[in-house]
A protein has these predicted regions:
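A conserved acidic beta->alpha catalytic loop
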Residues: 50, 67-76, 92
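Non-catalytic, C-terminal membrane-associated alpha-helical segments of glycosyltransferases
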Residues: 255-325
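A conserved hydrophobic helix/loop-capping motif in glycosyltransferases and polysaccharide synthases
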Residues: 31-47, 54, 66
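Glycine-rich, basic loop-to-helix element that forms the pyrophosphate-binding segment
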Residues: 90-110
């Protein structure tokens, strides 16, 4: 059972207190918050407004936004509304992994204690960052992710704790979890979905950066498993709640024209159906390269079967809390 591993925790409530509460650590921890954005001005501003309201006792926070070629006035709006935010302008071809790497590289120059990598389509519970830092302080060599919830259905989990299953054909995602079915204490996972992840600075100095060459998008699917292979622990702290915009569901392959399908699977590296991305996520992120290769082949077989109308039976999903009891 997962519960055989002990996890150090601290008593921090997730609800925003009426008065600022002293953190459980001594002194100040320096945290750089990094987010790569493009052409989502209002969403980015909403994210920054949310960050501006969080509890920051015991924290020295710097926010770094990498704007990769926005044409909707994102840079100007950030500088006018949040002048203390550091904005780095990209060339327009960084994509998500490259943008995050540029921001992380800038953050490393100031030698913070932690780097928090976030998506901009996110709003935050008032105590989330204090919770993440407290858990990281109590558990050395640990990367900590927040509990990702849907902002339009805030009781429902957005994405959490994907598990590698070679014979299923790759990462198996949980889709039916809620705030009532997840564990109450921090719990170990195989990979962390990168919408809100706190890295001790040593994780980047030891493990490198996101794999921009192979995964211009979805770099989190490879980076946190890479750290885990190096002996880092991956935890989700369910008390650190963050609320996310639901993903846009891409059209099914069967709904695409031949040209659209070709571009999706071969040309567009940011597309959910892109096979190159899928292979590299498996090859680099699976427990072993052999498992990654076999998992990818099985994924292709499943695609072929679905194309002729053969689908596997739905699998009952247990409450995640039961697996950690």
């Amino acid at each position: 059972m997962h519960g055989t591993t002990t996890i150090e925790t601290t008593e921090i409530a997730c609800d925003r207190p009426r008065a600022s509460k002293a953190p459980p650590w001594q002194g100040t921890r320096k945290v750089a918050i990094v987010s790569a954005v493009r052409d989502r001005r209002e969403i980015t501003l909403q994210c920054l407004r949310s960050l501006d309201r969080i509890e920051s006792a015991g924290l020295d926070i710097e926010t770094i936004i990498v704007d990769d070629g926005s044409t909707d006035g994102t840079c100007e709006a950030i500088r006018n509304t949040f002048p203390e935010t550091h904005v780095i302008e990209g060339s327009g071809d960084l994509w998500c992994s490259g943008g995050n790497n540029l921001g992380v590289g800038h953050a490393l120059l100031d030698d913070p204690d932690y780097i928090l990598v976030i998506n901009d389509d996110t709003v935050f519970d008032g105590r989330f960052l204090q919770v993440l830092v407290a858990t990281a302080e109590a558990n050395p060599r640990t990367v900590v992710g927040g509990l990702l919830l849907l902002w339009d259905e805030p009781h429902r989990v957005f994405q959490i704790a994907p598990r590698w299953d070679t014979w299923y054909g790759g990462w198996r995602h949980l889709t039916e979890q809620t705030v009532w079915t997840v564990p109450e204490a921090p719990f170990d996972v195989e990979t962390i979905v990168g919408n809100c992840t706190l890295f001790p600075v040593a994780a980047f100095r030891e493990g490198g950066l996101f794999a921009t060459k192979w995964l211009p998008h979805f770099g989190d699917a490879e980076f946190t498993p890479r750290l885990r292979k190096r002996g880092w622990r991956l935890l989700i702290d369910p008390r650190a709640r963050v609320f996310n915009q639901p993903n846009e569901v891409p059209p099914k392959m069967s709904e695409l024209s031949a040209r659209e399908l070709y571009e999706a699977v071969w040309k567009k590296y940011n597309h959910a159906h892109n096979l190159r991305n899928r292979f590299m996520m498996y090859w680099l992120g699976a427990p072993t390269k052999l498992q990654g290769f076999v998992g990818f082949v099985i994924y292709l077989v499943r695609l072929a079967l679905q194309a002729i109308g053969i689908r596997s039976a739905p699998r009952r999903e247990r409450p995640l809390r039961e697996e950690y009891e």
